[in-house]
C-alpha cells in the first residue's frame, strides 16, 4: 500500500506552508483505521498558517511517534520533470518520481503502511502509535512541529520515542541514522565608511578593505576540530553588497552576510562573541563603524544512543544486513524541536535527489524502509 499512499501524497501540491489537502487525506485514512485525530491550524496571517495533525492509536506506553512534514519545496520548471508534472507521480523503471518523493512523503507512506499493517496483525499490542505531521517544515518552521508539540503535551499526550522520517541515508537504505544535528546561526555585518571620488582616496574612507580583512580571517579561522559525532564547525560567506554600480565612487558602506553551522562545542552566543572580537579589532584599525546582527534558527544537539536508539540500529542491521552509522551531518530539521520531549532517531530514504528536479525514490528502497519501520514496531510494541 505504500506505493499507493505515496502516489496519492505526491498529488497534493503542498508547497510550504500549504497542505493542499495532504494532511486531510492522512487524517481521513487514519480515522478509518481507528486512530483518534486532531487537526490544528496555527499562524496569524494566511501566508504563514500551517496545518498540523496529531493522530494516535491506543493509550498505553510506550508510545512510538512518527514525526514528519507533508510540505515540499517549490518544484522549479515543470517542463524539466518527467511528464512535465512534479505533482503527478510518475512510475518508471522501478522508481517513483515526484516532488516530495524522498523529502519526505515516501517515509510518511512507509510508516502509514507499516503502522496500519502492524495494527491489523497485532491486536492487543502493549503500546500506542502516533503521528505528528505538519505543513510547515521546509519554510520558517514557526507554526508547525514546534507549536504542535507544545499543544499535544498540554493536552496530556506523551511520546516515549520518535522517528523523524527525513531522508537520512547516503548511498543505500540503512547506512545512516541521525542522532543529532548541527546548529545554524546567520550573521549580517554592515560597515560604514565615507564615500568619495576614487581620485581622492584621502578624502574618503573605503569600508571594503576592512571588510576584506575581516572576511579573510573569518573564513580561515579554525573554529574547532570536530567531535566524535560532529564534523568541525564551518563558516560560509553568503552575500557581499556595496550597492555601488559606479566605478569612480568609493562606497559609503558595505554589507556582508555569512552563516556558521556549528557543533555542540559552541552556541550561537559564544560564536557571536568570537566573531565580534575579530570585527571590532579591524574596524578600530580602519577607523570605521560597524553594526553586527545575528539570529539562530537552531542550536546544535546530540543524543547519547540509549536503549531504543540502539534497538533501532539493531533492527536496521538485522533487516537490511548493513551496519548503520550514527551521524549528525546535513542541515536543520524538526528533530531540533522533538529532542526536548523524547529520544529520537531520524531515518528515511536516500537524500541524493531531495529538492532536485526529478526527485525520485526506488520502489525497492520504499520496501526496505517499510521493513525497518514494521520490524521496529514489532520489536518495541
From Swiss-Prot:
EC number: 3.5.1.18
Active-site residues, as the UniProt record annotates them: 71, 137 (proton acceptor)
Sequence positions that bind Zn(2+) 2: 103, 138, 355
Catalytic activity reported: N-succinyl-(2S,6S)-2,6-diaminopimelate + H2O = (2S,6S)-2,6-diaminopimelate + succinate
Cofactor note: Binds 2 Zn(2+) or Co(2+) ions per subunit.
InterPro entries: ArgE/DapE_CS (IPR001261), Bact_exopeptidase_dim_dom (IPR036264), DapE_proteobac (IPR005941), Peptidase_M20 (IPR002933), Peptidase_M20_dimer (IPR011650), Peptidase_M20A (IPR050072)
GO molecular function, one term: cobalt ion binding
Entry superkingdom: Bacteria
Pathway info: Amino-acid biosynthesis; L-lysine biosynthesis via DAP pathway; LL-2,6-diaminopimelate from (S)-tetrahydrodipicolinate (succinylase route): step 3/3
Binding site for Zn(2+) 1: 69, 103, 166
GO annotation terms (biological process): diaminopimelate biosynthetic process; L-arginine biosynthetic process; lysine biosynthetic process via diaminopimelate
Disulfide bonds: none
Necessary cofactors: Zn(2+); Co(2+)
Gene3D superfamilies membership: 3.30.70.360, Zn peptidases
CDD domains: M20_DapE_proteobac
Stated role: Catalyzes the hydrolysis of N-succinyl-L,L-diaminopimelic acid (SDAP), forming succinate and LL-2,6-diaminopimelate (DAP), an intermediate involved in the bacterial biosynthesis of lysine and meso-diaminopimelic acid, an essential component of bacterial cell walls.
Subunit structure, as described in the record: Homodimer.
HAMAP family reported in the protein's UniProt record: DapE
Family from the record: Belongs to the peptidase M20A family. DapE subfamily.
Record protein name field: Succinyl-diaminopimelate desuccinylase
Species per Swiss-Prot/TrEMBL record: Rickettsia felis (strain ATCC VR-1525 / URRWXCal2) (Rickettsia azadi)
Amino acid at each position: 500500500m505504500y506505493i499507493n499512499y505515496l502516489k496519492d501524497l505526491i498529488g497534493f501540491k503542498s508547497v510550504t506552508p500549504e497542505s493542499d489537502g495532504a494532511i486531510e487525506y492522512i487524517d481521513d485514512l487514519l480515522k478509518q483505521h481507528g486512530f483518534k485525530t486532531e487537526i490544528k491550524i496555527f499562524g496569524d496571517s494566511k501566508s504563514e498558517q500551517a496545518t498540523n495533525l496529531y493522530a494516535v492509536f491506543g493509550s498505553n506506553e510506550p508510545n512510538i511517534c512518527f514525526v514528519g512534514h507533508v510540505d515540499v519545496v517549490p518544484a522549479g520548471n515543470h517542463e524539466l520533470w518527467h511528464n512535465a508534472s512534479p505533482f503527478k507521480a510518475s512510475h518508471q523503471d522501478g522508481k517513483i518520481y515526484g516532488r516530495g518523493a524522498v523529502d519526505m512523503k515516501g517515509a510518511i507512506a512507509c510508516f502509514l503502511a507499516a503502522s496500519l499493517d502492524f495494527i491489523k496483525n497485532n491486536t492487543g499490542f502493549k503500546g500506542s502509535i502516533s503521528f505528528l505531521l505538519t505543513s510547515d517544515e521546509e519554510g520558517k518552521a514557526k507554526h508547525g512541529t514546534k507549536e504542535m508539540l507544545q499543544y499535544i503535551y498540554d493536552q496530556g499526550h506523551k511520546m516515549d520515542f520518535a522517528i523523524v522520517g527525513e531522508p537520512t541515508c547516503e548511498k543505500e537504505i540503512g547506512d545512516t541514522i541521525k542522532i543529532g544535528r548541527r546548529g545554524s546561526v546567520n550573521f549580517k555585518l554592515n560597515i560604514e565608511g565615507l564615500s568619495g571620488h576614487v581620485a581622492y582616496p584621502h578624502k574618503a574612507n573605503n569600508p571594503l578593505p576592512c571588510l576584506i580583512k575581516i572576511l579573510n580571517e573569518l573564513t580561515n579561522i579554525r573554529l574547532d576540530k570536530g567531535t566524535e559525532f560532529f564534523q568541525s564547525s564551518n563558516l560560509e560567506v553568503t552575500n557581499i553588497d556595496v550597492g555601488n554600480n559606479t566605478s569612480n565612487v568609493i562606497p559609503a558602506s558595505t554589507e556582508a552576510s555569512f552563516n556558521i553551522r556549528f557543533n555542540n562545542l559552541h552556541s550561537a552566543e559564544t560564536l557571536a562573541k568570537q566573531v565580534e572580537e575579530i570585527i571590532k579589532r579591524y574596524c578600530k584599525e580602519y577607523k570605521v563603524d560597524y553594526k553586527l546582527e545575528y539570529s539562530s534558527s537552531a542550536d546544535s544537539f546530540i543524543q547519547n544512543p540509549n536503549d531504543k536508539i540502539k534497538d533501532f540500529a539493531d533492527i536496521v542491521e538485522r533487516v537490511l544486513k548493513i551496519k548503520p552509522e550514527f551521524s549528525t551531518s546535513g542541515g536543520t530539521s524538526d528533530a531540533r524541536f522533538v529532542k526536548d520531549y523524547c529520544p529520537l532517531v531520524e531515518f528515511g530514504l536516500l537524500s541524493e535527489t531531495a529538492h532536485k528536479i526529478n526527485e525520485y525514490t526506488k520502489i525497492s528502497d520504499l520496501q526496505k524502509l517499510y521493513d525497518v519501520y514494521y520490524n521496529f514496531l514489532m520489536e518495541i510494541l
